[in-house]
């Protein structure tokens, strides 16, 4: 992937990321990102971008967001020393316990932030997509918190293997819609949510769950999830007395990983993303997008995707419902291309 850049370009791009200059005004992370959407969705994305610029870093919004993270989500989440794993692997292993956040995963950080934004934008209802179900549960909980109706789209295959989360969403007041088109997993759920958003772009807020899709979503999700890396850095200094040699995170769409990695970009730490290996390296056998994919456009963003020689997006395979996505966030594509991750 480094062949995308001429001498010095990768270093300059990475420095821009460290300095907070990415995405640029076009929503791009170097060659990746951007906004490739139907004309009917352009006003909705422009309205969302304007709302993000107006509210996201406004002191009042940030005060409300930080209060919700502290009093409702339960942050900071713990950093736990894994003694037996450390003994087995011959290295000190620390676990950032996002499982201890309200609803059981990191997804709630992004969900409550976007729900607060949706409330400020004056929409009538919220829609969301989900793969493993965690983002659906988080969206349902966040919408209940701010008093907005919520509809969650979920691939039929994922609904079968994640039935307990479907039940949790419904108990939290959300409507769950099974998507039976396409591969019936996360990609199909995102497609269906986008189709619904087109029908009423001013009355509906689309609460996207990962750092994927068209600008400004990759930026918005990164900003809301960066609390993971910010807390981890301080907790390592407080508890271990030093920063780690390496930080690992799983990568599907990439919201967990970008939340951990982004605050650590400027630090001399090896950043390692782990993808779903599935049953092999061939197309359709895995969800290892960065390891086996090629550049292309998927769901509004130019990024790395799993596609055949004709540019047809391929189905994925993984026992993990949260990692079986045919693409990856554009910032991850950039970070891999520069060699930082």
What is each model feature region?
Residues 5-33, 39-40, 46-123:
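Positively charged, low-complexity intrinsically disordered leader regions
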Residues 34, 78, 95, 107, ...:
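Buried hydrophobic positions in well-ordered alpha/beta secondary-structure cores of metabolic enzymes
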Residues 61-68, 89-100, 118, 171, ...:
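Gly-rich Lys/Arg/Thr-decorated short loops/hinges at beta-loop-alpha junctions or inter-strand turns
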Residues 96, 153-154, 180, 207-211, ...:
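Short beta-strand segments
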Residues 102, 110, 118-155, 242-256, ...:
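A short, small-residue-rich loop immediately preceding and capping a beta-strand
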Residues 125-127, 135-193, 282-293:
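Active-site-proximal loop->helix
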Residues 185-196, 203, 208-268:
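Glycine-rich ThDP/TPP pyrophosphate-binding loop and its adjacent helix/strand module
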Residues 190-216, 220, 273-341:
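Active-site/ligand-binding loops adjacent to catalytic centers
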